[in-house]
Amino acid sequence: MWINWPCTDNSKKHLIMGGYTTFLHPGVDPNKIQGIVLNPMQQSEPSKVAIFGNACYSWNIWQSKEEAQKCWNASFKYVDHNSAIETQASAALRELSKHMINQNMDGRVTALQESVDLKDRLTSFKEALTNGTTISDEQFKDLINEFTILKNASATYRAQAGDIRIKDQIVYWLNCWDDTADAAINYLKAVKAVQDEEANDKIYWTSCF
């Protein structure tokens, strides 16, 4: 069986760092499969996350999404430094990869879910901002914390990557994470300052420094 995943030929600006259950379905009859071949991304090294999943699946077809998620969580330890022991770097790569899964394209590709734990909170924030309703301090704190985690994850992986080849192939995405996280944190701080009716000079210093 040939699977066109995690191929990015039609979307070279993306990384596809997930999608286990979308392409490797739980509970498939193993008698109907003689082998599985994947079509990798443009970047060979980060494609190993999908290759690890394919190896797990081919060895023992998972029976649930929870089992697949467990394999996905474990994959980064082996992809980063080929060990059952998690490191700060492998955990950081996994954290970033939660948000680098969907190609965000048209109907030519299968839609994948990313930022699952964050998207509802972001949507709630955006709706409140659009509607002009008060955003709680807890919401601001929660989202600033999330983007701080991502900012730190990028820095950690850049400094401690177990496999430098992966880091080198995803360096542009790490650069993007640095800029995106900084922009998001400063934007959230600025919105909070405006909502709190801070003076303009304080808003500038709050959001930029």
Model segments located where?
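Substrate-binding groove of N-acetylhexosamine-processing glycoside hydrolases
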Residues: 1-209
